[in-house]
């Protein structure tokens, strides 16, 4: 069971007192409060009040309670530090009786962005593969719920930059876009007003395309080497990508997996009589070679 801290206890005690004050019989006419309906977060303002003499003023907000003695002049001054958290507030004034009124504090102008880009790596030319999501906050880190324009600027390693503008929905803006045709670093920047945040996604080569192997025999051994392995956009597959060489001869079927090094894959196989040799990379199959003792 979670223990209640001293600060939490004091807050609960104050709220209980306020609740009790609000239900006390109003045997005398209390001063009237007339706060504005909405206030921008962090903006000082005044509440017109009708009454005379002295009273106790309470301001109950989403994350704190303010209490102070006031003189019932023409208006009550509310400090900017008292209304930094967005949400509903209750103003309570107690002299011979208690009266209350509510008002709403709304987020100020956009001042911070929380920006997420997914994934960190993506194959080139893949539809709807990049997700960008931005959360818009004001300077007090209230989520700005009113619609705000957010520009997502995409700058690929090669090719022209482009952008998309969307409006936030309850503080959130997002897009889904295709990866570009060329491998390399792609920067995505979210911009709202004078605020911007940038993230990077690394585009890598897609599946192999036009995979071909050539063979050089030497006795009962054959050396197999691929042409430079690239995807359909001409991007080289990264070193370490596995290429599979398969041989079928009188001794049976065998497969050797070899990583790409410096753009090509290379291996040696022993051959017994007639043989059929093929190459594949992932789900992509390349050419086949019929080996009859000479190629």
Model-derived features: positions:
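The feature marks long extracellular or luminal low-complexity segments
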Residues: 2-9, 27-295
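Short alpha-helical segments used as structural interaction elements across diverse proteins
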Residues: 10-11, 23
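Sec-dependent signal peptide recognition
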Residues: 12-18
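Hydrophobic h-region of N-terminal signal peptides that target proteins for export
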Residues: 19-28
């Amino acid at each position: 069971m979670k223990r209640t801290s001293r600060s939490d206890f004091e807050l609960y005690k104050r709220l209980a007192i306020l609740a009790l004050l609000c239900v006390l019989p109003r045997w005398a006419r209390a001063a009237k409060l007339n706060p504005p309906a909405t206030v921008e977060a962090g903006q000082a303002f005044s509440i017109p009040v009708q009454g005379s003499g002295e009273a106790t003023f309470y301001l109950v907000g989403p994350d704190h309670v303010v209490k102070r003695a006031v003189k019932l002049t023409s208006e009550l001054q509310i400090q900017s530090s008292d209304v930094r958290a967005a949400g509903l507030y209750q103003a309570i004034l107690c002299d011979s009786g208690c009266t209350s009124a509510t008002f709403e504090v709304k987020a100020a102008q956009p001042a911070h962005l929380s920006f997420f880009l997914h994934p960190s790596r993506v194959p080139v030319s893949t539809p709807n593969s990049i997700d960008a999501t931005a959360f818009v906050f004001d300077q007090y880190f209230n989520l700005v719920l009113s619609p705000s324009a957010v520009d997502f600027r995409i700058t690929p390693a090669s090719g022209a930059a482009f952008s998309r503008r969307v409006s936030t929905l309850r503080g959130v803006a997002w897009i889904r876009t295709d990866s570009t045709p060329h491998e390399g670093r792609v920067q995505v920047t979210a911009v709202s007003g004078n605020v911007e945040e940038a993230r990077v996604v690394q585009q890598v080569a897609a599946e192999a395309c036009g995979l071909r192997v050539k063979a050089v025999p030497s006795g009962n051994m054959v050396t197999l080497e691929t042409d430079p392995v690239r995807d359909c956009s001409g991007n080289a597959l990264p070193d370490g990508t596995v290429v599979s060489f398969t041989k079928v001869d009188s001794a049976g079927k065998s497969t050797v997996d070899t990583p790409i090094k410096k753009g090509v894959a290379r291996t040696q196989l022993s051959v017994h009589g007639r043989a059929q040799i093929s190459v594949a990379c992932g789900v992509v199959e390349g050419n086949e070679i019929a080996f009859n003792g000479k190629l």
